[in-house]
């Protein structure tokens, strides 16, 4: 960190444990655009105006009831003192009836203050939770429309951190900061008025401490800011490492990379710990220094108050009340320092949430088309595409798929096969040329309608934590149990399902690790069969199953592809011998095109690939 040399703060000894000793502490991080972020947040708060105004009113009432207390208590002290003096002089006695009634009134004031504070807290908790609920809901909806390119530039851990940690920080900080801000300002004004009503000289002594407090706040915030800025970002990186290590734990163990993984985590964890420790160390100095200033105010009040009492310009009750007010005056000033840190943290977390919500969405034309004719005719016309502007993957790709045809795409790893499928699904838009379905450019299609016409089976299976029945039904939620089981039989997975405990009600765990890779693939194929979409995308769907299972799947696939336009990316070339057209891709270009027999007869790149696979098998 470049800023570390600016302020010499000793590096703390790192504490082991999750995220070091500091854990996930992020308080005090400064937002890049504090004012802009707060304006956006006010838009969310404005949705709950009545509740917020009511909370403010109850907070003000609570403070007012609390502020009046020392004044009343001072009157009781004066009355008691005067009564005792009169009793000693034999001219009177202590008026305990008046004192009892006054103390009863004081008790009612404090009870009313507590009730108002309780109601205010209940209202603000409701407001903050509703705001967090709305933000999480908007984030969930946003994920569905954010382009794939966004996730290429952001780790899963970073996105999850925005959804969980940042929203939680917002909720906690908003509730705390709004309450403290309202009560602190109200208390400062109210206490100042009460102190002026008691003694102008004593008030002047107390107010003299404000410039010192302001200087301390400014200096501490200034020096702590450099260490606040990276905390939220580093936390996202830490979460990303944790998510990645958890998902790839088997690979880490197999390749004995646990130590390297721990070292990388420790490196990021050290950054989070050091920046968090230093920022909190500096901001933590604020309270002791503010207490020092407050104590100096006490000393000044005692000295001046004693002089006023000796000259008869102040009563003992006045001095006692004023000392209480001095404490009530310095406390909210200190709280404003905490509010400053809390609001900086809140703004930083909120800014990250708003950054995600403001991320570019997948373009959707207002007049997007939903063609009545089901897709079957697909045409790539001189398509050019690259994930980044400086690296083109697809250079000049052209091909045409007639309705019901099976188009097989083969080629070495990195040739651009899967990229073509992503373009067809419009996860990305082409950089040049056009891609048309039923004669309509996919950029003019309604995205949901376009994707809803394709069933997909990918090499990387995705199953969620639910029963096998519900995982298959995911392809068509309204399907009956009989239809689910029919799809499973077509995918040749009915037999192994019945061997599991519970059969179709067998619960798949997270990541689907209680099924074999081949079994998971069969379930995803059954899901695609049940979906019964007019077009199919099979991305090396049989590459993770054994030869016997592959034969079973292939027979099911042959029947499934009848009458449907199918795009098949194949690793095992033996599975695409019956394809209507085989496209051989290398470096983003078509180098060969034809049927299986035609390409073998040519003796080119495809023939070499095909023969090499059989040579390896032999």
Where are these regions (language model features)?
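Juxtamembrane loop-to-helix connectors within ABC transporter transmembrane domains
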Residues: 37, 45, 124, 142-189, ...
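Transmembrane helices of ABC transporter permease
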Residues: 47, 51-64, 75, 176-230, ...
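Transmembrane helix-loop-helix hairpins at lipid-water interfaces of multipass membrane proteins
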Residues: 52-116, 196-201, 299, 310-316
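Alpha-helical segments in transporter systems
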Residues: 20, 39-42, 50-75, 106, ...
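Helix-loop-helix
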Residues: 83, 194-208, 222, 278-351, ...
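An intracellular "coupling" helix at the cytosolic face of ABC transporter transmembrane type-1 domains
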Residues: 47, 148-149, 167-174, 178, ...
């Amino acid at each position: 960190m470049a800023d570390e040399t600016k302020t010499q703060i000793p590096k703390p000894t790192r504490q082991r444990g999750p995220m070091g000793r500091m854990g996930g502490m992020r308080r005090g991080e400064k937002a890049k655009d504090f004012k802009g972020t707060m304006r956006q947040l006010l838009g969310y708060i404005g949705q709950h105006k009545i509740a917020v105004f009511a909370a403010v009113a109850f907070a003000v009432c609570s403070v007012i009831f609390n502020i009046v207390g020392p004044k009343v208590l001072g009157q009781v002290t004066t009355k008691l003192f005067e009564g005792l003096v009169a009793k000693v002089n034999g001219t009177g006695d202590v008026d305990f009836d008046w004192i009892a009634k006054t103390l009863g009134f004081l008790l009612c004031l404090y009870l009313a203050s507590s009730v108002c504070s309780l109601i205010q807290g209940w209202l603000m908790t409701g407001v903050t939770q509703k705001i967090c609920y709305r933000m999480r809901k908007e984030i969930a909806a946003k994920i569905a429309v954010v382009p794939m390119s966004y996730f290429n530039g952001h780790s899963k851990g970073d996105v999850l951190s925005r959804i969980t940690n940042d929203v939680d920080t917002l909720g906690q900080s908003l509730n705390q900061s709004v309450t403290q801000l309202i009560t602190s300002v109200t208390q400062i004004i109210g206490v100042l008025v009460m102190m002026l009503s008691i003694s102008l000289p004593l008030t002047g002594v107390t107010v003299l401490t404000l410039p010192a407090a302001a200087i301390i706040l400014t200096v501490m915030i200034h020096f702590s800011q450099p260490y606040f800025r990276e905390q939220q970002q580093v936390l996202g990186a830490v979460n990303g490492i944790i998510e990645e290590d958890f998902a790839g734990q088997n690979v880490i163990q197999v390749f004995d990379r646990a130590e390297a993984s721990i070292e990388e985590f420790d490196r990021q964890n050290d950054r989070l710990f050091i920046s968090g420790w230093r920022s909190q160390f500096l901001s933590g100095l604020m309270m002791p220094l503010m207490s020092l200033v407050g104590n100096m105010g006490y000393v000044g009040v005692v000295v001046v108050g004693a002089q006023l009492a000796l000259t008869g310009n102040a009563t003992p009750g006045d001095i006692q009340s004023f000392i209480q007010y001095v404490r009530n005056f310095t406390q909210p000033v200190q709280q404003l320092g905490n509010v400053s840190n809390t609001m900086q943290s809140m703004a930083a977390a909120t800014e990250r949430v708003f950054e995600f919500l403001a991320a570019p969405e997948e373009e959707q034309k207002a007049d997007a088309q939903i063609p009545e004719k089901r897709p079957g005719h697909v045409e790539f016309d001189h398509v050019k595409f690259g994930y980044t502007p400086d690296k083109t993957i697809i250079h000049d790709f052209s091909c045409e798929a007639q309705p019901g045809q099976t188009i097989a795409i083969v080629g070495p790893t990195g040739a651009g096969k899967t990229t073509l499928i992503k373009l067809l699904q419009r996860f990305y838009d082409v950089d040049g040329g056009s891609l048309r379905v039923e004669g309509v450019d996919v950029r003019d299609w309604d995205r949901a309608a376009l994707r809803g016409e394709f069933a997909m089976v990918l090499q990387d299976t995705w199953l969620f934590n639910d029963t096998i029945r519900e995982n298959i039904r995911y392809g068509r939620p309204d399907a009956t149990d009989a239809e689910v089981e029919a799809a499973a039989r077509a995918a040749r997975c009915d037999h192994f399902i019945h061997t599991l405990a519970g059969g179709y009600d067998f619960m798949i765990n997270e990541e689907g690790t209680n099924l074999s890779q081949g079994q998971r693939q069969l379930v995803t194929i059954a899901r695609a069969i049940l979906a019964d979409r007019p077009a199919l995308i099979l991305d090396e769907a049989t590459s993770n199953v054994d030869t016997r299972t592959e034969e079973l799947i292939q027979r099911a696939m042959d029947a499934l592809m009848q009458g449907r336009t199918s795009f098949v990316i194949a690793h095992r070339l033996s599975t695409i011998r019956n394809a209507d057209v085989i496209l051989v891709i290398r470096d983003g270009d078509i180098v060969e095109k034809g049927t299986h027999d035609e390409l073998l007869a040519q003796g080119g790149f495809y023939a070499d690939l095909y023969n090499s696979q059989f040579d390896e098998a032999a």
